[in-house]
Regions:
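Single conserved hydrophobic/aromatic residue that forms the stacking wall/gate
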Residues: 1-7, 11
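Conserved, structured C-terminal
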Residues: 9-218
Length: 218
């Protein structure tokens, strides 16, 4: 999860964490004086990734120090994108140097056009969420569609991160029957036999690919 602090008492969190925060505020810590609100539709975002991403970002924000020291990994700053206020995050979903730029949704098209215009010098190429998902998997991130409320650290070889002594959020869940049953569903990786075939997202695994419909999935 990524968090940036733009003020001492204001935090912005990305990814699908709103439902978790609402759950804990209602049932676990109802005494806390904290409000959460979704601002997703108020912002437009673009990821700039690759070995030349810092060069592109510097031309987009010439007045900012976006060097490794000025904007370290997981860093955050605000800037002016040709008259438009922008929020800049250094975060990578691809394993390469990458940034994410957010502007108010009304300025989304303007931001996109500027990124493409400035990026031409560096042979920039647009890529979509399908490509991003592939890059994210290659990076090693396990999130999104791979995880749900039934997934535990032991499913992903992350048992070394689970403390046996200290308390932590979710520790109680690890002792529930549903999470320790030997026949429980688990998240696993699927690799094609020829190592080349790309398995589309959302594909079904069936016992006999040539069987007539309906063909039950495994």
């Amino acid at each position: 999860l990524f968090r940036s602090s733009a003020a001492s008492d204001v935090y912005k969190r990305q990814a699908n964490v709103l439902s978790h925060l609402e759950y804990y505020l209602q049932l676990v810590w109802p005494e806390l004086n904290v409000n959460v609100v979704s601002s997703t539709e108020q912002w437009a975002g673009a990821a700039i990734a690759g070995p030349k991403s810092r060069d592109v970002l510097q031309k987009l924000f010439p007045d900012l120090d976006v060097s490794n020291e000025g904007l370290p990994f997981m860093g955050y700053m605000e800037g002016n994108l040709f008259g438009v206020n922008a929020k800049i995050f250094r975060i990578s979903f691809s394993g390469e140097l990458a940034y994410e730029v957010n502007v108010e949704s009304d300025n989304g098209n303007f931001m996109w056009e500027k990124i493409i215009e400035i990026g031409k010098e560096f042979n920039i190429q647009p890529y979509g969420t399908e490509a991003l998902s592939t890059l994210r998997i290659e990076m090693g991130h396990v999130a999104g569609s791979e995880l749900d409320g039934r997934t535990i650290p032991y499913d992903n070889s992350l048992e070394g991160l689970v403390s046996k002594k200290k308390d932590f959020i979710g520790k109680r869940s690890l002792s529930k029957t549903a999470y320790i049953a030997p026949d429980r569903q688990r998240v696993v990786g699927v690799v094609p036999l020829d190592k080349k075939t790309s398995i589309p997202e959302g594909s079904y695994i069936v016992k006999d690919a040539k069987a007539k419909l309906p063909n039950p999935k495994l």
